[in-house]
Amino acid sequence: MATSDHSLLGYALLGLIRLRQPCSGYDLRRFFAGGPMATFSDSPGSIYPALKRLERSGMVSCTLDETARVRRRALYRLSSKGKNSLRRWLAKPIKADDVLRRMPELFLRFSFLEDCLGPGACKSFLESLVLSLQAHITMLQDHLQSNQAKMSRSARLALRSGIMGYESQAAWARMALDEYRKSNAN
């Protein structure tokens, strides 16, 4: 993808098209509106321009469904270029600041990971996520320990809330990793 097309919406569309192809823009909009990806805008002003950018960049192909009753529907399929781009994005290593700045992206990547790259990739991803989260939690706890005497009560409580949120995500990642490890053992 060109730099301007490296948006989470673009990758979400690539992942969904891969799983549901062929699908129309309307099908994708409905999925965004009523499902777990509701954080993305389901407006035609977001989805259709993003689909056009993906088509222009060769990530998806579009054909017209002549069998539609009322009007022809554009049906999207992932191209080999789109599959490769999606795979590269999914396989990116987790960087230290990803847990601080890009948790929604990490969870979006994880949601497509098994279908695209298999359970082994999920296990590796979760192992890396646990390590990254634990490093970040340790850094925050050290900061709290070193600075709590200088911090206001509200600042300490806000920081503790952040730590607890990361601890919750780390606990989830360990639970998910255990599930993958158990499935490998069977």
Go through each PLM region and give its residues.
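Residue-level signal for short amphipathic helical patches enriched in basic/charged
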Residues: R20-C23, G35, D42, L113, ...
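Mid-protein regulatory/catalytic core that forms ligand/cofactor-binding pockets
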Residues: G120-N186
